[in-house]
């Protein structure tokens, strides 16, 4: 077995060796002219120039092309709506998953507090009998009152933010009313110079 391995390794190792070969043209041979690549038969160019001719469209292809052309504005509109609504839907789904996970691992005492806050909203709905405005105001007020008992820090933060927003809205409304008042109701001294009295 050793002899077989020795014989098979010998010729394989010789194939990896490199040898230099020195070759020179014979001095008495006549000088040959070289051929260009285009002159070789392998690279011959066909004599006739090929021309691409497009096949005429069939009636089905023409109808599909017209349908695609007419539907393009609608498809682009749908793609635009999809690109705008997909992040919002993903955000809403993630919000739902987060709330579900929170409710699955709720802190102790969360559900009794939630029941008291919901009951406060129901009591507000009972007190609001008769008036539609009371039905809109009383339940959120009672629920907010119940929530502020259990979550005072969050209630203070929400009250501050709400107060700032209400003040900002009131200031904007005052400015708008003041501008409208100045435009529509001028002082009595300016009545002579108004464009209507010429």
Swiss-Prot record:
Does the record's keyword annotation contain Coiled coil? no
Which of this chain's residues carry glycans? 63
Per the UniProt entry, the signal peptide is 1-23
Its cellular-component GO annotations read: cytosol; endoplasmic reticulum membrane; extracellular region; Golgi membrane; MICOS complex; mitochondrial inner membrane; mitochondrion
The family database entries (InterPro entries) matched by this protein are listed as: MIC26/MIC27, MIC26/MIC27_animal
Q: Where are the transmembrane segments?
A: 108-128
**UniProt subunit comment:** Component of the mitochondrial contact site and cristae organizing system (MICOS) complex, composed of at least MICOS10/MIC10, CHCHD3/MIC19, CHCHD6/MIC25, APOOL/MIC27, IMMT/MIC60, APOO/MIC23/MIC26 and MICOS13/MIC13. This complex was also known under the names MINOS or MitOS complex. The MICOS complex associates with mitochondrial outer membrane proteins SAMM50, MTX1 and MTX2 (together described as components of the mitochondrial outer membrane sorting assembly machinery (SAM) complex) and DNAJC11, mitochondrial inner membrane protein TMEM11 and with HSPA9.
What this protein is reported to do is described as: Component of the MICOS complex, a large protein complex of the mitochondrial inner membrane that plays crucial roles in the maintenance of crista junctions, inner membrane architecture, and formation of contact sites to the outer membrane. Plays a crucial role in crista junction formation and mitochondrial function. Can induce cardiac lipotoxicity by enhancing mitochondrial respiration and fatty acid metabolism in cardiac myoblasts. Promotes cholesterol efflux from macrophage cells. Detected in HDL, LDL and VLDL.
PANTHER family, sorted: MICOS COMPLEX SUBUNIT MIC26 / MIC27 FAMILY MEMBER
Regarding protein family, the annotation reads: Belongs to the apolipoprotein O/MICOS complex subunit Mic27 family.
Protein name (database record): MICOS complex subunit Mic26
Q: Which organism is it from?
A: Mus musculus (Mouse)
